[in-house]
Amino acid sequence: MSTTTPEKPEEIIDATGTSDTAEKIEVVISKEEPAEQKNEVEEPDYAQVPAESEDDAAQELAPTDSAIQVVHVLEAPQKAELVTIPLAHSEAEDHKLADADRDQEEELVFNEERRKTVTMDDNASLRSASITFDANRDEQDLLNESFASNPTDETVLMQKTKDEMDATSERPRSPLDLPPPPASVVLHPSAPPPPPPPLSSTEVVGNTTTTTTTHYAPKTWNDPSITTAPKIPVSLLSGAQPLPSVLTQRTTTSSYSAPNYSASSMSGVPSDVAPPPPLPIPNQSSSSAASYQHHHASSISKSISSSREDLLSEHATSRSTVREIPVHRAPSTAPSHSSVFEYHMMPTTTSTYHHVETPSDEYYRREVMTRTIITRSTEALSQTPLGRPASPLDRYLPYPTTTTTTSGDGRTREEKTVDYKVTYHRDIEEQERRIREDQARRQQEEQDRRDREDNARRILAQREHQEMERLREQQNLSERALAERERADKERLQQERLLRQQREKKRREEWDRLESIRLAEEEAELARRRALEKERIDREKAEEERKTMERLERERARLERERLEEERRQKEKAETERIERERREHERIEIERIERIKRERIERERREREEKKAEEDRLLRERLELERIERERRELEARERQELELQRREAEDRERQRLEDEAREMRRREEERREAELVADVHRQAEERERLRKRQEREEAERLERIRLEQQKIDMERIDAERRERERKEEERREFELIEAARRKKEARDRDRLDEMERERVREEEERREKERREQERRIAAEKERKRRQEEEEEIARLNELQRAAAARQAQRNAELDRQRQRDELDRKAQELSEREMREKERRDRERANEEAQLADLLERERHNQLIRENERREAVERANNRRLEDRRSRDKLDHIVRERSEKEQFELEKRRLLAEKEAMNRKKNHLLSSETLAKLTQPMYYTTREPEVTTKVERQVIERIDRNVWVEDVPYAPSQSAMGYLDNDENNRDRLYNPNDLNRNGSSRSRYQRAKNEKARRDFYHSSQDSADPVTERFRKSTDDLTTRSRPEYRGPLLQKFHDSEFRTTALNETDGLPYRRMGPSPYEQPFAKLLEETERRYAHYNSRASNPSIYQSSRYYYPERHGQPQHTDNTRAESVVAYERESRRESPADQAHIRSRSADYLMDRRIREETEVPENQLQKTRVEPHDQSPRESRISEYEMRFRKSTEKLTVPDWYRENRPQGQTAQTSTYRYGNGVEPMSTTTTTTTVINGTSSHQQAPPPVPPQPIGNIGLPRGMFDRYKDDIEELRRSRSSLHQTGQQETSNRQGSTLSVGGIVDQGHALPGYTVSEVPNAWNLHTSRTSRVVEVADTFVGTSSHEYGNFTNRYGGRVTIEEVLDSIFQKVTPTNQRLNFDRSYPQADELFQGNVDGPGIYTNNYSVMRQVLKSPERAEHILQNEELFVRCTECHRTRELSAARLFFVSCKHCYTYYCSRECRHNNWPNHSGRCSFARINTLCKDVIMKVREDEQAQAFMSKVARDGFSVSGRGSVNIRLSSPQLAQAYVSNGWRALSAYPNDQLLYYYTVKALIAERKEPSLIALCNRYEPREKFILSVSIIADIEHCPETPPPETRELSAVQFSSPRSRYEAIQNQNAPYFSEFAHNV
């Protein structure tokens, strides 16, 4: 098998001389080579010179494997001498050789640029060169070059050399004889090559016509007289060097394929496949005839004609091998590319000769090249420098190192070839004629080929059709045979079935006759046996009754004895217990007496220790003061020494810092170098990883391609399987009728068997009474059944063949299904693999992005480090400058230290003097008759009001305790105050009538008024006589006696004790330290503040309207009223939080001249501002912050506040209050909470009352203050605000003796505590969630929960604000009312700025996250809504409402939110978009599923209100339960939500399948508390009217995966525990309610 390889056209470059004729010849040669030779032949790369125009690029190829030439005449040829070659052939042979020559020639390539590079020197040198060949010399002396200046000598020498070679080789004298073929192309002996056609050429030059004919004679190819010429392609040249003028070619193979000669023309159609290049010819030596014959015995070359015109042109020579032609004249020319060549860089070339042609004959020019092989030894004879060879031929005939050959004796030789060209011309008409004939012939051949293909295709289609007809006929025959067999089988089976039926009918008739006879006999025998059995049973029964009576009598006697013994033991046990109780009571009383004595002794010892410790402390303070003064002096001296040492160390530090800076700079430079290396290494690693990734991607692409091919294979198998499946279905359809007939027969047998089994069952019922006969009948029936089964087995055997066939088909089908599953598995694996590869690709992309990010980060860090280093450089420079400055200032600093030392010594002397004066002033001030003492005695008392005659005991104790404290005023002074400033105070000016400090002291006119009263009392005291009846003196004396005789804790009142214990709280769930306390009740002192507040609200009404917008609370809590164009900062209390109390103090109200009283009590009750007190001018001044004054206000403590502070510094908790703290008393707590943001709104009102050892939990309005005990009312004075707390403390102290009894009763009774935390996730949830109790005995899953909702609406149907029962269906909750308002709002296009933060959210803990999404910022209004949800529409009609998104907390005004806000489909949860609703579903799904069940419970309640039948059943259960157990509620228990929905849809008849005792239950109040039911349900059960109403609750058992649990009750009093922050309180509540908090997330 041979392959046709196209070969690039090769450029042949002429370097023999200049010429004006430019031609271009392109040749495409087709070559057939054996397959086994393709790997051995190295095809050279032939260069092609590009065309300079479109005409130059024209090519026309014949459809055969011969070459086509295109010759373009580009310019006028150069005139040259015409060379005539004598021919020895006839004219006919000339035409044949001309045709063959036309097929073997190539186009001449013209390149005008080459001609321009030829110099005159080159032309002259080349024209003067001549070559002399000596054929008689041996191989070593093969080449002998001689140069002459006469050009004619060259021609003579060449002709002489040619004649000698012809005589030596003994070849034919034909001038155009062909050389022998090479050894590599020897033909197979069985297929000799055909002789080539003759080649003829006709040339017209002027008026002379020259015809040349080349004849190819069939002769032996191994003719020794034939020579070959090597040829080297252009591709061996370097790309940077000019092309050589002559190319040679070398052959390295030993095979030859016969050339295919066919007529062609230049206008023919090019062939589809370009012909391959000619076979290379091995390099041979031509030194002698013997060596020539030895090396060229099997060589052959192509015939190429040459002419003198070709030798004179610049065109490149052909690749074709040529025979030697004697040349008479050889003018040389320069190389076509450049004039300078190195012989070792260029292939071997030859000289060419040219002659002048006419321009009209250029198109028909043909080229024949003759090659003469010239060898040269490796000694490089007469070699000139490489720059310019000595001979003109050397520059054109280089000897590359690769073009060498080895002779027979092993010595290396280099070879050189010289090409000669002869061009012939032909007639144009002859060429056109041949072209037309070739075209017609090719068209005819193509038409014949197409006809043959059509005939073959038609014959193949006929054969396929006949084969299909044959197969179809065979299929029909097999189907008809199968149908005939099936029909015969059916008929046979039908006949057999009829025979069996007849035999069975006869057998059954015989069996019935025998059975009737047997039954008659059995009936008679059975009657006889029944009579005997009845007599035996009567006897046994009588005997058993007698024995039973005897046993019962013995048991009765034994029980009576045991009862008497048990009564005796009980009496003895009761007596023993009574004696033991009396003994324990006596022991307890004795222990209490001993403990009381011990406590009194311990208290006495403690007082003695305290007095002793006080004395020791006083002496210690005096000693410490003296030591402190001495220590200060020593410290001053040590400080001076330290400063001198510090100066020295600073100098050393500066030097050390300089050295460190230099070292740091060196380290910085080293770090920069390392970081640069690190960045370069990272870049290198990234490139390596990128290369690996690309390789992995390439491997993945290949793997995907393999998977695609496998997928195609799987698809083909699937198609084949589907075809086979269709064939199987067709076979099964034909077999279905047989199987169906067998199935019907089997069903008939089954029916008979069932009938027989039914009769057998009847017989078994009769055989219970007669076992022996029954056994015989069973054996007979078994024998009959065995026969029937035998017949069935025989019938089944006949069907085994069909079943086996069906089984085989089923097995085949299963196999196909298995293969299908395998294919599906392969598909799945392929899909997984592709997905895995996709993920890997994404991972690689991510890694690449990460690496890029890391590189960017490294660069950014490098830039940042660079900035840091620059800053360090600047800082180092600055430090150096500072060190130079500090060195200059060191002398000045030493002088300054000396001056400071002297000034400090003077200051110390002045300080000692002033301290002495201060002590003298203090002694004078503490004198009995000093102005300070008189001011204390004459100031208004704390309890003094307009009705001073009424004073409570608690107030007297507090006031007396305060009055007994000595008040000392210590005025602090600033450190910068001068030494003489201590003398300029009010103590030094005490006796002056006018004190300038009075105007600035506390900034109040009350101090001036008080001081005037003190001065008047002092003067009266000095001038009046001592009166023993003076009440002031008597009271002072009494107070002094009490201080010395009574223990200090006994004078401590409960009010102060409660203050120090932080018990002035109003909530049990919130940490309120640091917040204003709530309002306790009305007071006359609130009137001035109310007026001021009303005026403030009137002035800032526009602020209240803006405060409802939550966006103003984003950044600041101050509002900015316009005042002279400047914003005035005022502290905003944020519209009063729900947990913020209405704190109103006399300190914050303006001074009232009609009523002047002390502010100590207000200061006592307000812990938040105790550390920072301001002048009580008015409320606005209290929190105003001036824009230009940003410094904090300095605290100015008034004399009364200082006095009270000193009086309460050392107070302790009295023992009577600590030991007898009230326990189990009525504790009323009211908590209102309304959260912001995601923090919920909740209202919890809890009242826990202990009565007779029981506890009840009720939901009630806020508590009413209790009435005072003993009909003693507190005066309307300064304690009016706190009278509730004082009254409570008085009650607790007056009833201390009742505490022990109440504790005893509490221990004996069953105390049930209902927690104060009743937060279910909604404001008024009305439902509970719990696990299914075990007592219910229901089979439920682990995730089943019981959702219970109570019908808590028991109010009247009419209301002052409308019939809301009809409007809301009786379900009045916060969510339902707010949702109805939201649905009624008309949407607008208003777009408000939303606030993503939590507007008005305080930092206190909020109990849940399910507060209503619709709210208003007016907390007082929201409190009213919480109390009365049914009045929500009326309360909120003038308020601005907002809606908040549960997911992103986006806030909108109600009308604007109506456009795009959406809600959950099952509950009242709002979202700003469907995306937020989708994103929040994982967190909301648990509660929402719970809410759906809650809604379904409410639907059941509403259905019951309309269902009279249900009400009748429930009313009966309620009456019976109340008459038996007391108050309680009726509960309807539904086992699933589907059952509840069925009841809502169909009414009570949907529950008719369930008994009432499985649906309706009655729970007492005690059971509800024990099961922790909804507090509102318990409250309703305690107050409803049983004769008129009943309470209903609905329980649905639902399987909810994440259902919130009912929070457990609070087991301890959180208000009694101190917390450092709201966060700590939140954590405490969270730990206590772990099950509840585990289901919901809370935000604090």
Swiss-Prot record:
Organism, scientific name: Caenorhabditis elegans
Composition bias, Polar residues: 997-1007, 1295-1313
Record field: compositional bias (Pro residues): 190-199
Coiled coil (UniProt feature): 428-924
Disulphide bridges, residue numbers: none
Residues reported to bind Zn(2+) 1: 1445, 1448, 1472, 1476
Tissues with expression: Expressed by epithelial cells. Expressed in sensory neuron dendritic tips.
PANTHER family, sorted: APICAL JUNCTION COMPONENT 1 HOMOLOG (PTHR21517:SF3)
Summary of subunit composition and partner proteins: Interacts with dlj-1 (via L27 domain); the interaction regulates ajm-1 apical junction location.
GO cellular component: adherens junction; apical junction complex; apical plasma membrane; apicolateral plasma membrane; cell-cell junction; ciliary basal body; dendrite terminus; plasma membrane
Functional note: Controls adherens junction integrity. Required for the correct rate and completion of elongation of the embryos.
The UniProt record lists the keyword Transmembrane helix: no
Bias (Basic and acidic residues): 30-41, 160-174, 307-327, 410-455, 744-791, 815-851, 1012-1022, 1032-1051, 1141-1150, 1164-1173, 1183-1198
Cited InterPro entries: Apical_junction, Znf_MYND
Disordered, as annotated region: 1-20, 30-60, 142-339, 381-455, 561-583, 647-678, 744-851, 977-1052, 1122-1198, 1292-1315
Origin organism lineage: Eukaryota, Metazoa, Ecdysozoa, Nematoda, Chromadorea
Low complexity compositional bias, start-end: 254-272, 282-306, 799-814
MYND-type zinc finger span: 1445-1488
Domain of life where this protein originates: Eukaryota
Name of this protein: Apical junction molecule ajm-1
Record keywords: Cell junction, Cell membrane, Cell projection, Coiled coil, Membrane, Metal-binding, Zinc, Zinc-finger
One annotated GO biological process: embryo development ending in birth or egg hatching
Free-text note on domains in this protein's UniProt record: The coiled-coil domain is sufficient to localize to apical junctions.
GO molecular function: cytoskeletal protein binding; zinc ion binding
Entry's localization field: Apical cell membrane; Cell projection, Cilium; Cell junction, Adherens junction
